[in-house]
Amino acid sequence: MKILVLNCGSSSIKYKLFDMTTKEVIAQGGIEKIGLKGSFLKLTLPNGEKKVLEKDIPEHTIGVEFILNTLISPEYGAIKSLDEINAVGHRMVHGGERFSESVLLNKEVLEAFAACNDLAPLHNPANLKGVNAVSAILPNIPQVGVFDTAFHQTMPDYAYMYAIPYEMYEKYGVRRYGFHGTSHRYVSKRVCEFLGVNPVGQKIITCHIGNGGSIAAIKDGKCIDTTMGLTPLEGLMMGTRSGDIDAGAVTFIMEKEGLNTTGISNLLNKKSGVLGISGVSSDMRELLAACANGNERAILAEKMYYYRIKKYIGAYAAALGGVDIILFTGGVGENQFECRESVCKDMEFMGIKLDNNVNAKVRGEEAIISTADSKVKVVVIPTDEELLIASDTMDILKK
């Protein structure tokens, strides 16, 4: 069985084609700059070589068509005919309260998803464009939606509600939803397989640290809390996002700077975080280089970034009533040992002891990085959201 996974952003489409008998990726790539000058498709050939194909891609349907044609092209193809694709799985960002698991996409589901557009005005309409594009080109192929918010739907009300007038929740659905759910679900399940333990009875803290970052508290395989909120702006300090901030500071800045809602949203989402504090970059690799050169603001940004992660681990250990496993994933979590080392430093009182020698060698691979006598297992698990989307799609087809 072959499943195509699509992740459609406002001006991009990432794709992976899986052969589910072996769970192998047989083709992958992405389109950037849809609707802009200089749009292109970048693909990875089976031998690992990368190719860039330039083409004018004014909108998503033409983009999806370009991807499908590339998949069957004599030069770069991975399959002989589009009939070999059994289904398409989509990453859908915001499922609101409607979706707590992955679903087969039909008219009714898509209407309910579109009703959540308010909650993710950038992402949801782009996700829908991808679904509609596939429907237009391959009308008979089954499509499945896998929601970023679904895994967090098990949070109790006292964890997801904001302490604002209750009508705001009733009228507009203002509450905490959380994101990166597909990643948190994948790694929390995978770490139990890796360690050979039953998810039931385990208290796990998963740290998805990338350009965007979130942490989840997971008990018995179910999410009980997560750091992101109504939008991905809450919680950790991120590449360009502020994370937690006093709402009073928001109105104060708006007044002083004469900003409207779009202006303040832009400031908090795109100009804050690591970039805003360091003035160097939103990329942690560039930040570490600046720290090594003694850049004081970069050093401050790094300290703030790690401190916020550490603080939430402590909070979630309290919420869970203890912790058995702490897991790092995401671009930074998987590849930067400095981040893991700083976050776990001086946490022996919680039973967390890192093996710094082992930790320093681990990059993008599954590994236990705590000492043999550490009460808490600290583990690195590379995330694979696309594989989980493909697996969900296959499971739903079998039903």
Swiss-Prot record:
Reactions listed under catalytic activity: acetate + ATP = acetyl phosphate + ADP
Q: Where in the cell is it found?
A: Cytoplasm
Query: Is Membrane given among the entry's keywords?
Result: no
Keywords from the UniProt entry: ATP-binding, Cytoplasm, Kinase, Magnesium, Metal-binding, Nucleotide-binding, Transferase
* A single cellular component GO annotation: cytoplasm
Name the InterPro entries on file. Ac/propionate_kinase (IPR004372), Aliphatic_acid_kin_short-chain (IPR000890), Aliphatic_acid_kinase_CS (IPR023865), ATPase_NBD (IPR043129)
Gene3D superfamilies reported in the protein's UniProt record: 3.30.420.40
Q: What is its EC number?
A: 2.7.2.1
**Any one Pfam family match given in the protein's UniProt record, by short name:** Acetate_kinase
- Active-site annotation: D148 (proton donor/acceptor)
The note describing how and how many cofactors are bound reads: Mg(2+). Can also accept Mn(2+).
Q: Where is this site: Transition state stabilizer?
A: H180, R241
Q: Where does substrate bind?
A: R91
Q: Which GO terms describe its molecular function?
A: acetate kinase activity; ATP binding; magnesium ion binding
Cofactors needed by this protein, per the record, are: Mg(2+); Mn(2+)
Pathway(s) served: Metabolic intermediate biosynthesis; acetyl-CoA biosynthesis; acetyl-CoA from acetate: step 1/2
Instruction: Give the top-rank taxon of the lineage listed in the UniProt record for this protein.
Output: Bacteria
List ligand-binding residues for ATP. Answer: K14, H208, I209, G210, N211, G212, D283, M284, R285, G331, V332, G333, E334, N335
Assembly and binders? Homodimer.
Q: Which family is it part of?
A: Belongs to the acetokinase family.
What does the UniProt function comment say about this protein? Catalyzes the formation of acetyl phosphate from acetate and ATP. Can also catalyze the reverse reaction.
Q: Which HAMAP family match?
A: Acetate_kinase (MF_00020)
Record protein name field? Acetate kinase
From the broadest rank down, the organism's phylogenetic lineage runs: Bacteria, Pseudomonadati, Bacteroidota, Bacteroidia, Bacteroidales
